[in-house]
Amino acid sequence: MDVQGFHHLAIQVREVEKVTAFYRDVLGFSELKRHHREDGSLRSIGVEVPGEGFLALEEVSGEPEPGPFRNERPGLFLLAFRIPKAGRAGVVEAFARAGVPLEHETRWTVYVRDPEGNRVALSHHPED
């Protein structure tokens, strides 16, 4: 087997435009491409993850189910992105300006939730 790296992660979301705005406008990820269904409705939006790969935000119906900060259910736990240690204060300020509450912090990582309740971490662990 010759796995060469991360390609993408698909996340099902109810409000694809709102979630895309979080990753694009708050985290600064570039929007790559929009995909439409045969009827012309928006199906998904891809946003580039800095360094390698992308997130495919796939629109679905149904209610999101955000859980507590830490739960013991199988499945996606969080999306963690690397930041430089010197950039941490700027990350916290950017979330405050965007009205995104911090859910939890450790000495290395800042945790928030995207608009649909998915846990997102920005981390300089183990000290970049």
PLM segments and residue spans:
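Glyoxalase I/VOC metalloenzyme domain signal
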Residues: 1-6, 11-33, 49-102, 113-128
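A short beta-turn/loop motif at secondary-structure boundaries
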Residues: 36-40, 111-114
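Short, solvent-exposed loop/turn segments that connect beta-strands within catalytic domains
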Residues: 39-42, 50-51
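Short hydrophobic/aromatic beta-strand element in the GNAT-like acyltransferase core
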Residues: 44, 109-110, 119
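Short, small/polar residue-rich loop motifs at catalytic or cofactor-binding pockets
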Residues: 105-107
